[in-house]
Amino acid sequence: MKKYLMLFALFAAAGAQAKEFFRVTDLPDGWQAHISVEGCKDNHCGGKGAVFLYHPKQETTNVFKSDDLIFERGEGSKISAAKSPLIMKDFTFDGLKDIAVATGNKGPKNSPTYDIYEQGEYGYFGSNYSLTELTKNYMGMFRIDNKQKALIVTNEVDCCTRIEERYRYSPEYILTLFYSRSVDTSDEDKVVVTETRTDRRGNEKTTTRTYTPAQWKRLNK
């Protein structure tokens, strides 16, 4: 009971200027979250907000603040994890769920950005600068390849060139680029794909292939 009274006090204090309060349902592994946000108009919520994350079996309550906690609300005071401004997955491949908290649309071409927090001992989450920067320098939230233990990011250089890069993550918070691909569609009659692979010794190998638009479309079905 004492734990939940403390949580309520934190929630009330941090959300003193907030106008809307929600509970996030169906987070993984039993995690629970409440969020406060400055305001909502129609179904769109945004502005300054706070996230209160806790687990019934842990003593720690984590509080994350955001300058622009944007998300689409549903009906009532509950929102599903999928529609919330939170993403809980294992970003660092250590078997523990980490969390991404929305911070607005500050990435390239107004793409969404997130603050990333890595789970440590006893349910405590600490800020992860390296992963946060990935969301600011590329377009949107990175994807996870569990088989390769890689983080996948994308970007658009100009109107016709799209970039994909893959990074390995080490426990020392180091990101190592090991694969990049650029797809150039500036010529309507061809697609030029350049791939660079880097092995663990740092040796690079670059290949360039040209496809017709129809061939490229078939390859990416």
Question: Predicted regions span which residues?
Answer:
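Repeat-based blade/solenoid architectures
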Residues: 66-85, 132-142, 161, 189
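Acidic, small-residue rich beta-repeat scaffolds with periodic aromatic anchors
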Residues: 17-52, 146-221
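Sec-dependent N-terminal signal peptides
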Residues: 4-13
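Beta-propeller blade termini
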Residues: 21-26, 36, 80-91, 136-150
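Hydrophobic beta-strand segments that make up the repeating blades of beta-propeller
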Residues: 99-103, 151-154
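Beta-propeller blade repeat segments, especially FG-GAP/WD-type strand-to-loop junctions
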Residues: 54-57, 110-129, 166-171
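Acidic carboxylate motifs that coordinate Ca2+ or other divalent cations, activating on Asp/Glu
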Residues: 94
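Beta-propeller fold detector
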Residues: 63-67, 126-133, 176-182
